[in-house]
Amino acid sequence: FWTVKVWTNKSKRSSQSKVSSWKTGLMDKQNWKSNWITVNNEDMTSPKIPYFINDFRVDSKIISANLYITSRGVYEAHINGKRIGDAILTPGWTSYSNRIQYQAYDVMEMLLTGENRIGVMLADGWYRNFRQNRKNRIVDYGERTSFISELIISYEDGRKESIIDEKNWSYNYGPILSSSIYNGERVDMNLKNSKWSFPGHKNKNSKKAKIASRYKGFIDYTRNEMIKKREVLSAKELIITPSGDKVIDFGQNLVGWVKF
């Protein structure tokens, strides 16, 4: 806990600030008690995006709940049907062989009394890539994507619980048939399942997840600004080239995606 009071060089002083506090994250990979989670061997090379789920119960009053998560690949995490955070392409691009960044989220308000579900979507990101213009897959950092997460819950009665049960993770596939940093996504909306991360929802064709190899590099908390949606730009001009191709001009350089 900390509080602040300021004195000037003219002996004037401010009022005392309100008491505040901070939380210490997982300082070293040895602090992570959970295992890395991945798909089973037969799905290892599939370009489809797996949707992982883990069900757990909360039966006492909570005073805090924090999710710590990172991945070899990029992830999007959900709890009880709601997306966690607003960052995109987490955990970001680092030299995965040496260092991976993790993120921490306050998820106390997302938890329910009784049954709960945490869900994780996992894509290749910068970690590995399927290049559509070649027959063979090019591996950038590794052949198998995976994630690690730890949900730490503190209860009013003084107990602390870590949701790390790797045996309870399962996965199936959804509408995203492939996802690439360089080649975009292929999506079949006929396969969309908007309730996949709802507690109690039965996902069809679920498979038991597998424990992945441990990460040998350094796991560090995010040091940089996260990638987020900043603004929406309207198209300025539709250009038709001599060959008949249509080019949409937004009037400036940008990094983002197109919505029709």
What is the predicted function of each stretch?
Residues 1-3, 8-10, 21-28, 42, ...:
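Accessory beta-strand-rich segments of carbohydrate-active enzymes
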Residues 11-16:
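Short, exposed coil/turn segments at beta-strand boundaries within extracellular/luminal domains
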Residues 22-33, 198-225:
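Predominantly extracellular/luminal regions of secreted and cell-surface proteins
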Residues 35-43:
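Short, solvent-exposed loop/edge segments of extracellular or virion-exposed proteins
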Residues 44-49, 209-250:
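Edge strands and adjacent loops of beta-rich recognition modules
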Residues 61, 114, 241-244, 251-253:
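Tight coil/turn sites that cap or link beta-strands
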Residues 178-203, 207, 212:
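CBM-like, beta-strand-rich accessory domains located in the C-terminal region of large
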